[in-house]
Amino acid sequence: MAVTLDKDAYYRRVKRLYSNWRKGEDEYANVDAIVVSVGVDEEIVYAKSTALQTWLFGYELTDTIMVFCDDKIIFMASKKKVEFLKQIANTKGNENANGAPAITLLIREKNESNKSSFDKMIEAIKESKNGKKIGVFSKDKFPGEFMKSWNDCLNKEGFDKIDISAVVAYTIAVKEDGELNLMKKAASITSEVFNKFFKERVMEIVDADEKVRHSKLAESVEKAIEEKKYLAGADPSTVEMCYPPIIQSGGNYNLKFSVVSDKNHMHFGAITCAMGIRFKSYCSNLVRTLMVDPSQEVQENYNFLLQLQEELLKELRHGVKICDVYNAVMDVVKKQKPELLNKITKNLGFGMGIEFREGSLVINSKNQYKLKKGMVFSINLGFSDLTNKEGKKPEEKTYALFIGDTVLVDEDGPATVLTSVKKKVKNVGIFLKNEDEEEEEEEKDEAEDLLGRGSRAALLTERTRNEMTAEEKRRAHQKELAAQLNEEAKRRLTEQKGEQQIQKARKSNVSYKNPSLMPKEPHIREMKIYIDKKYETVIMPVFGIATPFHIATIKNISMSVEGDYTYLRINFYCPGSALGRNEGNIFPNPEATFVKEITYRASNIKAPGEQTVPALNLQNAFRIIKEVQKRYKTREAEEKEKEGIVKQDSLVINLNRSNPKLKDLYIRPNIAQKRMQGSLEAHVNGFRFTSVRGDKVDILYNNIKHALFQPCDGEMIIVLHFHLKNAIMFGKKRHTDVQFYTEVGEITTDLGKHQHMHDRDDLYAEQMEREMRHKLKTAFKNFIEKVEALTKEELEFEVPFRDLGFNGAPYRSTCLLQPTSSALVNATEWPPFVVTLDEVELIHFERVQFHLKNFDMVIVYKDYSKKVTMINAIPVASLDPIKEWLNSCDLKYTEGVQSLNWTKIMKTIVDDPEGFFEQGGWSFLEPEGEGSDAEEGDSESEIEDETFNPSEDDYEEEEEDSDEDYSSEAEESDYSKESLGSEEESGKDWDELEEEARKADRESRYEEEEEQSRSMSRKRKASVHSSGRGSNRGSRHSSAPPKKKRK
């Protein structure tokens, strides 16, 4: 397949080169012709000559000479390359070629007969302008006979050579959209390799305490780019490293990109990593510092470094001088932390593109070049030779911090970060457990390993009162939470005591302020019912007087026909009547006299001389009242929806075309009756969803309480869900939950279709669905990463933890409820379910009984006026995982066997909060015996219940048994180990415990015999006073022999 050349791109770019040359700025002013020659050298990775070729043609052409004259261009290359260049040599009839000089192609011969071609090029140079000065890339020196003979030919002619590296670099620094897409792809691959491979590998090394050399880890990163899973869908053949990854730690730091990773072992302190990946010849770069257990001082210095990067991003704007950018950052260092001025890197980054580092676009104090929209920079800031005061070992005393990103200069506003790898302390910090916690866990693991047949009794003697099971730890933590809960709730309610809740009064509707404003219609004079649509009033004759009633006072109307008469019955709202759920029960003047109902009667028989029947007026009144009532109620409902709506700021539109955008999404709830597709776009201060019909829904970042991303793993839709702080209006309703989703598979299945297990169509469909899921997930993740970068991570998307999910029914149907870091959510079903954990006071589990397969969960909020949330039908198997999750979130939970009347409970608390907490507060939900006073006694009695208690026969046999039987008994009652909670019993050995058990057993048996004798005497006394019908019934089941009844 022939290699194609992008002709349009060539013409655009060569015109830009000539345009800048003809402007005559800087070195261009002195140049008569430009000569670029490229030889063969495998060691040269970056050179201006090859960069210019790649920029113009898309490929690197070795052993090729390019001469750019004032009115012509000459390319000399091998026959095969000349064939490739013929695609742009024929410019006739090509409108894109207008303004670009004509091309002459010369074929390079393999022998030394190239003199005639060299002479043609020399002649062309002499004819171009003054023909004396040539622009060259002085640093580019290629070996080989062909290059040597050409350079000798140039030197013989005595041309003045001027280095034009800087001006050509500035010309090609502004990237076109196609180039930017390649650089964005390169940046995303770099981010993927860092996140999914390097960061994970470092965490594994730290977790396992491995000894790994920097050089070995760097080699593994280079190998990782050969695997497709890290390349974000790119072809591995188009991906290469810009330079070998640089990994440094343990006090030896050199914050440059020319160094290599040493062979020292990685030290678990500040670990700097720099890596750059090249995609289709375009470079990207990323630098991060991973910190293991950083001290507070290290974290403060790192946060200051992030602040400097933010300042640098703000200064990188179109038209600003590069030196001004550098000075602005240095001013921040001088003002806030002058002691770090000599620690910061000498330059703050450099221009990047086809070449990794553009020397003429370095961000330092001397660079006078102006920034232009479309330039891409690698910004790199770091502090070296910092002293760690808490460091004890030599490698811990010195550390460095280094961060860097690939960024794009925009027209207005700060530069856009292309490498979307999070860099806050919480994202790059690796916090380990302290040694005490590790030792505890190790001891626990060793103890578990020791547990075996015959060893349990031995282990029981070693168990101390300080050792706790997971359940005991959970209970202890819950006990602490219970004490905190009551104290905080009491304090909160005390603070709220002064706030009086404003009771909403029912609106008084006055139709006419005085009688003169009433309409003068004939119907009113004729004592007929008249409806004034303008003032929404029904004027009725009452005792011969036209009386106005506003439509709001009418509850309902009914009409019936009985014989020759039509009856119209009108019912009114009045105190004491049953009102609708949304109607207030408060009247402006409840002491006034109210009309409850009025009934009118009219004849259905037309009298002689009348045109219509009298009942027609009632029929018309009935119809019009219904219409007016409907219109009034619709308007009232809309006004009620608008009540309490907080006015939002206006959305600031970002006119940049590179805004994060997702297409082909549906919105829930629907804007119209039918669902419509649209696109979601992120702007400066919020999102805008635009439907295909043109409807717009704006969601501001500062109004988002929870931003959730529900991947399509195990689901039929992929969702972005926004739970809002304040409701927004669209579709004439208020909404606090808005989500955008797209379907990933067939929601419905054709049951009539005959399917075969190995049907190719089905297999192909499944493969297509898998690819679609992966594609959608990648698109959504890229969108989220761009949004988080755009908002400086002020808006962070939460992904539900599916592993912690459990089934339950918060509404009518069962769904999978999944925790996130700050909420409990279900976003796939509608209506959605979102509970913010910070607003939760406590969780109560109801109907927790052994014989039931499921239980209910009640969520009580800190705002006691808010209705509790019920989640029904949760499987019992989920109880322990839910408890563990709630405990880890520091949420108090209780459980009980009954369902409680929560409406009554919450009303009692709200009415008398002080009395509620004086009586123990929420402790009434605790199971009996878990109070603070009775806890020790309960634990002791529990131990007594669970301790091995032999029967009388067993006791007699034990006298003759060997010691081996004790170990078997201990094995059978290993749970007694867990029940030894008191200080006294945990300190005694097995023999002493057995002896105590025998004594307790003998005492209990004696007490039982005493109790039986007392009960027998009571029964005998009762039988004396009875009639004798059941006299023998009481002694029938007694263990004592029956005695004769006294007479």
UniProtKB/Swiss-Prot annotation:
Lineage of the organism: Eukaryota, Metazoa, Chordata, Craniata, Vertebrata
Species the sequence originates in: Homo sapiens (Human)
InterPro entries registered for this protein in UniProt: Creatin/AminoP/Spt16_N (IPR029149), Creatinase/aminopeptidase-like (IPR036005), FACT-SPT16_Nlobe (IPR029148), Fact-SPT16_PH (IPR056595), FACT_SPT16_C (IPR048969), FACT_SPT16_M (IPR013953), Pept_M24 (IPR000994), PH-like_dom_sf (IPR011993)
Entry's transmembrane regions: none
Cross-link Glycyl lysine isopeptide (Lys-Gly) (interchain with G-Cter in SUMO2): where in chain: 497, 513, 647
PANTHER family in the cross-refs: CDC68 RELATED (PTHR13980), FACT COMPLEX SUBUNIT SPT16 (PTHR13980:SF15)
Disease listed for this protein: Neurodevelopmental disorder with dysmorphic facies and thin corpus callosum: An autosomal dominant disorder characterized by global developmental delay, impaired intellectual development with poor or absent speech and language, and autistic-like behaviors. Corpus callosum anomalies are visible on brain imaging. Most patients have dysmorphic features including tall forehead, down-slanting palpebral fissures, ear anomalies and broad nasal bridge. Other variably present clinical features include seizures, sleeping difficulties and precocious puberty.
UniProt-recorded name of the protein: FACT complex subunit SPT16
Biased composition annotated in UniProt, kind: Polar residues: 499-514
Coiled-coil portions: 432-507
Gene3D superfamilies (UniProt xref): 2.30.29.150, Creatinase/methionine aminopeptidase superfamily (3.90.230.10), Creatinase/prolidase N-terminal domain (3.40.350.10), FACT complex subunit Spt16p/Cdc68p (2.30.29.210), Pleckstrin-homology domain (PH domain)/Phosphotyrosine-binding domain (PTB) (2.30.29.30)
Function: Component of the FACT complex, a general chromatin factor that acts to reorganize nucleosomes. The FACT complex is involved in multiple processes that require DNA as a template such as mRNA elongation, DNA replication and DNA repair. During transcription elongation the FACT complex acts as a histone chaperone that both destabilizes and restores nucleosomal structure.
Residues recorded with modification N6-acetyllysine: 139, 196, 223, 513, 732, 786, 904
Domain of life from the UniProt record: Eukaryota
PTM: ADP-ribosylated. ADP-ribosylation by PARP1 is induced by genotoxic stress and correlates with dissociation of FACT from chromatin.
SMART domains assigned: FACT-Spt16_Nlob, Rtt106, SPT16
